[in-house]
């Protein structure tokens, strides 16, 4: 989890904590080491090596004829995507997602041409290294959904790359089929080494935010997923068996899946600061291989959106025995927050947005209302606790005056706790409902930046709810400002911050509880936090800031309604009645009694120290 997300959690915690006081108080094989992961420069160099430089059949054997040819292209496609295949290396040359565009409203290509490279390393019978990228494949068959590319090694000896699409599916089946090549390859070759590289294009308007969510992700064969660091260059040697390796952007991914397992991998993620690309990922890995085995080696590529429900569906279809768990590509937070998103937020959001011409702004409003209604009992309980503390304020002030001075601090606290016990008030009661709401706020904080349903959806002045909206934008380089604010001001973020200040002001006008006296800096902190949140959330999705805005406005409305419904004079009368009853029958309140007893012992210890 990156530091910006952690900072976000801290900000949310402090806002909730402050309002609580205001309202109450985780060995690469030798061959892999010889063939390290491909960088863009090395790939360009390798592809630019003319085949004419190497003519000797001593190196290529019966594959030598396939080193000569002309690169041609063939296309397979369905309603969702178009894949161009190259006869040079038999690789996927480009992938276009038909239903999506980039932030410039141009066709969305995950990669094209030399932005990606793919190579399989074979060992010939005379122990020479053969790279699939050096050969020209023959087009054996081609239909709209399937293409067979063949690497010939003489009469009736070949290796086929079979690419298959399915209607309305982002998953590509890829089979490596060997036929009568036992005499062409080394019998000591027990693994196939694979190299894969891809540059990640900038697809979204908010580059820095997109960089934060672009991560090289991989899944262990029988375990959970892990990621390389997203904020800087990272290289990792993974000796464990892997199930898949994913090149993830904020909203789209390229995932390489093997039906058996990857033996190990060297993974490399490079952070590209400028230009049309944000990251460069490369992998050097291997899979088990038996030259005598005539069964096809099966793989899959997933080229598509990071849609939680779509990715989850692959574990319920023909790939369910693979236990892919591709949905974990979507960052939804740690276990508790992820559970809230999986079980509550995502189902409600999908239900609200299921249909044509859905207004996403209205959907977010309804989602906010549903969450607020679900949390209403906790909110009301917190308000009542705050009201009790407020009506007891005069009596608490009398205790403070009667037992003023540092030497009587323990007596003062003891008498205050005794008052709370007598009237049946626990000063901590108001904190618990606020704290119980925190997981929902953090879950939503994680959900909105990952919600592809918001992408390119407009609402009011925001053209795209998945990125920041722009009230003011500038190109002038202002010292220090871009680091903290970017080159724009988000109107939704500004309104959210103003609403938070209004909420703070409204509460501080009426809340006069002990917390403000014990923590005199808390009031200033609560006014300062919306300013900090403005700088922090200014580049976050407009959908998230819109949610925070209406959530804060609803909170203000709730507080106004609660004040009108709760008669503080009647509430004080009930507390006084409880006080009279407590003088007749001493009632144990658990926490309050333990706190009072602790203070009494502290007072006795203090007296003993003074006598010494």
Curated annotation (Swiss-Prot):
CDD domains linked to this entry: 5TM_YidC_Alb3, EcYidC-like_peri
Cited function: Required for the insertion and/or proper folding and/or complex formation of integral membrane proteins into the membrane. Involved in integration of membrane proteins that insert both dependently and independently of the Sec translocase complex, as well as at least some lipoproteins. Aids folding of multispanning membrane proteins.
GO molecular function: membrane insertase activity
Organism superkingdom: Bacteria
GO BP, sorted A to Z: protein insertion into membrane; protein transport
Organism: Azobacteroides pseudotrichonymphae genomovar. CFP2
Subunit relationships: Interacts with the Sec translocase complex via SecD. Specifically interacts with transmembrane segments of nascent integral membrane proteins during membrane integration.
An example Gene Ontology CC term for this record: plasma membrane
Family of this protein: Belongs to the OXA1/ALB3/YidC family. Type 1 subfamily.
Subcellular location per the Swiss-Prot or TrEMBL entry: Cell inner membrane
Pfam families: 60KD_IMP, YidC_periplas
Entry-linked NCBIfam families: PRK01318.2-3, yidC_nterm, yidC_oxa1_cterm
Gene3D superfamilies reported in the protein's UniProt record: 2.70.98.90
Membrane topology: Multi-pass membrane protein
InterPro entries according to UniProt: Membr_insert_YidC (IPR019998), Membr_insert_YidC_N (IPR028053), YidC/ALB3/OXA1/COX18 (IPR001708), YidC/Oxa/ALB_C (IPR028055), YidC_ALB_C (IPR047196), YidC_periplasmic_sf (IPR038221)
Membrane-spanning ranges: 4-24, 329-349, 358-378, 434-454, 484-504, 524-544, 546-566
Keyword annotations: Cell inner membrane, Cell membrane, Chaperone, Membrane, Protein transport, Transmembrane, Transmembrane helix, Transport
Protein name from the UniProt record: Membrane protein insertase YidC
